Amino acid sequence: MKNHIIISLLFLLVGCSKTPTDLDTLNKRGDTYYKVNSEEPFSGSVINKYESGQNQMKGSLENGKDDGLVTIWYENGQMVIKGTYKDGKKDGLQIQWWDNGQKMYEGIDKDRKLDGLWTFWYENGQKLKEETYKDGELISKKEWNEDGSVKE
């Protein structure tokens, strides 16, 4: 009896998990994605792939707009961008990488405004600059040369 309940729960959980929808199968009007032949904005997990089959983008939409974690990859499988969105706007941690795998930048966005510490790197991995923002306004900045020495 116990095994029967466990197996039933497993089938229920598997049945509830949805395969992400291919982004190319949705219609985009303005900045909102819709189901085909529908006026209803799409909500759910989405994915887009390169012709090679490699993931290009994974994310989720709520009422047709980016909502939650969005991840984008180069065709070679290296991550390009990882960031969070709310109602189609960047909201939370944003990270981007150079195509060689080195970080390009990392920081927090709040309603499309930079907030807190943002760090930027040269393609060689050396720190380029640190900027501190409050509500999108630059508060302080420190810069480095590509060799690691502080810029004057």
PLM feature spans:
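Sec-dependent N-terminal signal peptides
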Residues: H4-L13
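Glycine/tyrosine- and acidic-biased, solvent-exposed loop/turn segments at the edges of beta-strands
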Residues: V14-E152
